Amino acid sequence: MANWMIKGANLLRPIYEEMRKELVSKQFLHADETPLEVLNEPGKAPASKSYMWVYKTGQFEGNPIVLYDYEVGISGEFAKKFLSGFSGYLHCDSWAGYDKVENARRCGCWAHLRRYFLNALDVQEDKTDYSTIAGQGFLMIEKVFSLEKTPGKKSEYTLDEIAEIRKEKSAQAVQEFFKFCEENQGRTLPKSLTG
């Protein structure tokens, strides 16, 4: 059955390539990668990790495009090659490999950032103690998330209108969060979950 999948993928490769060209022509993209184990992969130990990369157009880019790219490892070179020709905003996590994507302006992912604070809360003795740095940071990000839901459905507003709403409502919460991080930077260990 795996051979059928491989043959089918090869037949669809020209369509996939056209979709990739369309994807990299957009102004806003999302990218992420996740490890997976493939049994009996040629040239690799059985327990070694490979990666599935996902690339998606932004929510205001018209017809959505989501493409997956399987690679044998994790390297910024894979993202650089896949996103060749892209020059826009790349919404991704803080992994340094995405720095290799030329002409991309990186935008940090608040969901990934939120996860660090949530993980730090999970290892606290009292997981509901929001007076800690982890708890306060988590609540501040939750506030940003709740304000970001305010604009409503994408069809209701233009990008300029959403930017204006963000200036009015979200900007102050974001500034407060970054100020909180700067003020507490010396109170956390660099290798800790909130460092």
Residue ranges of predicted features:
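Catalytic center-proximal scaffold of phosphoryl-transfer enzymes
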Residues: 1-195
